[in-house]
Amino acid sequence: MLWQGKSVRKATGGRYHASRGKKRFEIGRSPADTIIGTTRVKTIRVTGGNTKVRALRCEFANVSDKKTGKVQKVKINSVAENAANPNYVRRNLMTKGAIITTELGKAQIVSRPGQDGVINAVLIE
């Protein structure tokens, strides 16, 4: 777990004296790191009793073609580009904004696989 609260140290190196300890709502989670493979999702309970679905592995993407206005479920071949991190291309990690190669051609991911549990993409020319 990652604690995302305020630092205990000042910029000068001095110490802040906290009026309270760490709280559960200040804890973050490790990233989903969605890769290409047989679809595997994980459901997580979040604040307010709601749920988030994390895509840990994904085999297919819902690709939308702007010209025809149709959406097709297509197999993902590989990750071509990822502006979030160049190392993600080597590891085939998929995030929002990543460009993937599919059976229809190149497509850009518009959903957040680590939050939505699915990969929605738009075909690019």
Curated annotation (Swiss-Prot):
It holds the Pfam family Ribosomal_S8e. GO terms for molecular function: structural constituent of ribosome. GO terms for cellular component: ribonucleoprotein complex; ribosome. GO terms for biological process: translation. Gene3D superfamilies: 3.10.290.70. It comes from the Archaea. InterPro entries: Ribosomal_eS8 (IPR001047), Ribosomal_eS8_CS (IPR018283), Ribosomal_protein_eS8_arc (IPR020919), Ribosomal_Se8/biogenesis_NSA2 (IPR022309). Keywords: Ribonucleoprotein, Ribosomal protein. The keyword Transmembrane helix does not apply. Signal peptide: none annotated. Belongs to the eukaryotic ribosomal protein eS8 family. HAMAP family: Ribosomal_eS8. This is Small ribosomal subunit protein eS8. It comes from Methanocorpusculum labreanum (strain ATCC 43576 / DSM 4855 / Z).
